[in-house]
Amino acid sequence: MVATDSSDQVAKFDVSHKIIEDIVYSLSNRIFSYAEHVPLNRYLTQWNNSGRRNGFSNNVELFNLEARSGASAFLLGSYTAAISSPGVYSMMTPSSCLSLLNPLLSNIIPFYGASKPLVVHVAALAYLEQTYCADNVSVLDFSYANNFTVFASQSNVEAAHLALASTLAAKAAPVIHVYEPDAIVTTTDPSLPLLDSNAVVECFNSYQSEADPVSNASKALKHVNDYFNTSYAPAEYYGSQTASKVIVTFGKSETVAARALLAANPDVGVLSIRIFPFVAENIFNVLPTTCKSLVVLSQVRSTAVGTSSIYYSFLLATLLSTKPSALAISEHRYSLVESVTLSSLFDALHETLQLKAATPKAVHVDKSINVWESDVGDSLVLSLVSAYRTDKSRSVAFRPLFDNLTLAGVRFTVAQVSTANAVLTDVVKDVDADITILTTDRLPLHYRVLAKAAEHSICLLQSSIAPDEATKKLPYEFIADALEKGVKLVLIDPKKFAIDASNLPLLVSFIQLVKPGLGVDEALAVLAKQNNLTDTNLKDAVDSLKQSLSFINLDASALKDREPSEKELPSTAKETSFAPNAVKTLDEDITPQSSNWQTVAKQIIFPEAYKKKDALRPDVSEKVFTVHVRANKRLTPAEYNRNIFHIEFDLGDSGLTYDIGEALGVYGVNNKTHVHDFIEEYGLDANELIHVPSIQHPGHWETRTVFQALCQNIDIFGKPTKKFHEQLLEFETDEKERADLQILISPAGAPDFKRRAEVDMLTYADVLKEFKHAKLTAAQIAQIVPVIKRREYSISSSQKKHNDSVHLLVVVVGWKDGMGRDRYGQCSHYLSNLKVGEPLCVAVKTSVMKLPTSPLKPIVMAGLGTGLAPFRAFLQFKEWQRMQGIESGDILLYLGSRTQREEYLYGEDWEAYHSANLLTHIGQAFSRDQPYKIYIQDVMRSTKDMLKKALMDEGGSFYLCGPTWPLPEITSVLEEVIQSSYDEPVDARKIIEQWKEERRFVIEVY
């Protein structure tokens, strides 16, 4: 939805939600985002990662958290902590999560202070019946139950001012700022203007709050009006001053739909509530004196349609207590899953209010375009609206909608272009399309794509259907809608176009429609730069375009002897997601294919035609970095049977950054000698090319040599699965081998299968060589052998101390298999053999291993073997804090290994930190250094008083990293520590569960 272009003449598209996030970031010291499945923090995360400071020149702490029961405990704990720094606390969440946050968030009132305003920015959004819908009822119910004041934005352009006003009001009491979800996905050009950060801060600093939250909310709104020359009010009236009937609305959808009725109904007005709870005086001040009746629109839950809403009941009580008999007040309830539109509102109220039908007015809209396409790859919309980008007198807004449940992912976009010298800040609803664009003829089989087409509009359909077959093969509903509305149908066959897999003929046709009189070559020139076309490409495109286009003449005979579909088709896509479908179910099985060097040569010579992309690891979704080995040192003696080593990587100019507690994902490489041996034994060509469909870059293919694929991608030396044996059976041509394979995958062969896997430890390579008559090509091997999985290792350094390197602590996993062969863990062995200066691919993985917010809180660390790695990073960070003059609480370290002589990992570091009084206590458990075994839990049990002081008396945090086996015993010790703090028996397990919720009990075991 956001696109940029290096050209000075090309505008930038931005999501409307940016203006909300900008206010939040400018005013907040701490931001808690509970929006993992909804894009409410896109810009917040970008700005925070870039080191942007807020408007007060302070660093911003951004916490992206899971939305689950008890999730608000982290915010509550941070807010109520004695050492919590002053400043605005902001939360981002969809309204559907409020019920999960409610139990704990309601406890914040007793601790509330003006120095720490709390404002909750809520996208009124719920997911019901497999679609997203506007959800204001959750916000209003939450507000009423917890005494939170609510500010409602009624358009995208208002959102910045209302976000600011709600933050001002939060100086007196916690506040919710609610906005409807169009802001999340509506993209505009030019960008909605961001408020000046200095002005925002000045406005905030100059505001003096009142004690009463309701009157304070009105005052905050007036303060914003005075500062920015706006005219927002707690309740706003639209319509005639002589209206006798008024519709009361809350939120954007209700207000927009109700206001659309006014043109045809002068006796009707609209009263939009902006602040809840409300004051009767604010309502009566704006209502016409002629008003005799109010109809309150009330959104309710589907299970409560028969019951008045809390919102309506509160409004009724407020108004009647002031003027008991002045008005007739009624309620129109509608459920969460019902969308409020002009037509639905007219149907519901036309008898009650004696309404006349109203025609939606496309205010400031010159062209409305509906685009239906697969959600694979980039959207066509940016290319389509490029025709307007150089026209400074017009603006563009578009709103994509993703239906992940149809055709493995459909993107439906409404794009609108403004009239001259007008600015669109949102997509205007209920406007029929002047142009409908379909990228495949499969879409009309699932939707009535022309249901929202305007009379005598145009439909561009990309399809390889023969023109004379179009009326027979296209669905009944599509033809019927086209005939009813007089839609002109143009078929565009991409196969007849000069450039393969190109949407250019469709785009050129569109450009000519919106720029009448423009020639084909001129239309192509508009798109040439955007599509990297050369002069040769342009000439070929012009010559072939006429062959690609067919104008279809439709008449009533096209429906003769045809019947409508048994299933009623929807007229729009269901919004089931805010992003393309990440999991594709393809109708045809696209598999790896053998390729040749001639094809690759064409891709290199003509990159613009093939849309060639170069990527470090195109097969993975994570951001990948290239680092180089700086040091690789074995920590255990050479004669010792365990190789544990410390390895350092030089970050160079890779741009890799990491936090303490995070892990480094390493993309291991198979042993090249073993790969060469397998290629030779199996009879493959190392230089043959394999063409693989890209998962991460849909619509693209990845090309590698066989040698590259077997080294970097295919887990050829991994443990073969039963599914692999079943797939291998399909290629088997020898009867005996086929029979052996069938027995092996049957229940009777289970013991033998287990022996081969766990004793003989056969690999995919072993099995392929064993069943030599099931001869596979390299492409077929790539199809049935899984990819090498990334291995992750806890980072043992802090970037505060080592700004240009990252360190790992790794043990080489080694054993002998049933055939006496030396075997090793693929990635640990790869790392151990790396030489200084060698490159490798890595990615950073976030972790739960985070230090307490307060540096004064004690921490207790328990690590076994290589599980000590993150605690070295912790101490390096604490060392850096001390250098900044930041004091630390007590730090206790418990470590477990086999022997002190061979496995005192990072021992010199621990001793140095202990001598420097940074590390308070070292508890050492070397299990094999004495006749009897001593384990880490034994050492912890011997220092229970120390643990009680750190964890119970001072509220410290406990961390465990290492193998899973000691977890029950260590937990038992902690339960004893908890019980020792009470005179009567307590449920220690429940307290540990509470610690987990508060992130004071963190484990990372493997």
UniProtKB/Swiss-Prot annotation:
Its EC number is 1.8.1.2. FAD binds at residues 658-669, 788-798. GO terms for molecular function: flavin adenine dinucleotide binding; FMN binding; oxidoreductase activity; sulfite reductase (NADPH) activity. One of its GO terms (biological process) is sulfate assimilation. Keywords: Electron transport, FAD, Flavoprotein, FMN, NADP, Oxidoreductase, Transport. Binds 1 FAD per subunit. InterPro entries: CysJ-like_FAD-binding, FAD-bd_FR_type, Flavoprot_Pyr_Nucl_cyt_Rdtase, FNR_nucleotide-bd, NADPH_Cyt_P450_Rdtase_alpha, OxRdtase_FAD/NAD-bd, Pyrv_flavodox_OxRed_cen, Riboflavin_synthase-like_b-brl. PROSITE patterns: FAD_FR. Pathway: Sulfur metabolism; hydrogen sulfide biosynthesis; hydrogen sulfide from sulfite (NADPH route): step 1/1. Gene3D superfamilies: 3.40.50.970, NADPH-cytochrome p450 Reductase, Chain A, domain 3 (1.20.990.10), Nucleotide-binding domain of ferredoxin-NADP reductase (FNR) module (3.40.50.80), Pyruvate-ferredoxin oxidoreductase, PFOR, domain III (3.40.920.10), Translation factors (2.40.30.10). The keyword Zinc does not apply. It catalyses: hydrogen sulfide + 3 NADP(+) + 3 H2O = sulfite + 3 NADPH + 4 H(+). Signal peptide: none annotated. Pfam families: FAD_binding_1, NAD_binding_1. Residues 622-852 form the FAD-binding FR-type domain. One of its GO terms (cellular component) is cytosol. Its cofactor is FAD; FMN. PANTHER family: NITRIC OXIDE SYNTHASE-RELATED, SULFITE REDUCTASE [NADPH] FLAVOPROTEIN COMPONENT. This enzyme catalyzes the 6-electron reduction of sulfite to sulfide. This is one of several activities required for the biosynthesis of L-cysteine from sulfate. This is Probable sulfite reductase [NADPH] flavoprotein component.
